[in-house]
Amino acid sequence: MKTLLLTLVVVTIVCLDLGNSLKCYSSRTETMTCPEGEDKCEKYAVGLMHGSFFFIYTCTSKCHEGAYNVCCSTDLCNKSSTSG
């Protein structure tokens, strides 16, 4: 019984891939699993003409600075309007 329990624990850990499982938004509705080395989620503003802008949602290792940007390190945290 102990062997079965140990096997289930090992299989669970392998399936979860604990070392690389951060999930971030890649658009307003789509999500992605971040590649190795990218340990933060980010939403940053890209300026257009006449003072308008749009947001880029992505995984990153280094976040952009800016008043409207979000940089965080927990799953699906880059959709909010505040950093976390």
UniProtKB/Swiss-Prot annotation:
The keyword Secreted applies. Disulfide bonds join 24-41, 34-59, 63-71, 72-77. Expressed by the venom gland. It comes from the Eukaryota. Residues 1-21 form the signal peptide. GO terms for molecular function: acetylcholine receptor inhibitor activity; metal ion binding; toxin activity. Belongs to the three-finger toxin family. Short-chain subfamily. One of its GO terms (cellular component) is extracellular region. Keywords: Acetylcholine receptor inhibiting toxin, Disulfide bond, Metal-binding, Neurotoxin, Postsynaptic neurotoxin, Secreted, Signal, Toxin, Zinc. It is found in: Secreted. Zn(2+) binds at residue 50. InterPro entries: Snake_toxin-like_sf. Postsynaptic neurotoxin that produces potent, and completely reversible, postsynaptic neuromuscular blockade, as well as broad spectrum inhibition of human muscle and neuronal nicotinic acetylcholine receptors (nAChRs). Inhibition is potent or moderate, depending on the receptor (alpha-1-beta-1-delta-epsilon/CHRNA1-CHRNB1-CHRND-CHRNE (IC(50)=2.56 uM), alpha-4-beta-2/CHRNA4-CHRNB2 (IC(50)=1.8 uM), alpha-7/CHRNA7 (IC(50)=7 uM), and alpha-3-beta-2/CHRNA3-CHRNB2 (IC(50)=12.6 uM)). Acts as a competitive antagonist of ACh. This is Fulditoxin. Negative results: weakly inhibits human alpha-4-beta-4/CHRNA4-CHRNB4 and has no activity on human alpha-9-alpha-10/CHRNA9-CHRNA10 and human alpha-3-beta-4/CHRNA3-CHRNB4 nAChRs. Homodimer; non-covalently linked. Is able to form a tetramer of dimers in the presence of 2 zinc ions. The record marks 58, 61, 64 as: Contributes to dimerization. It comes from Micrurus fulvius.
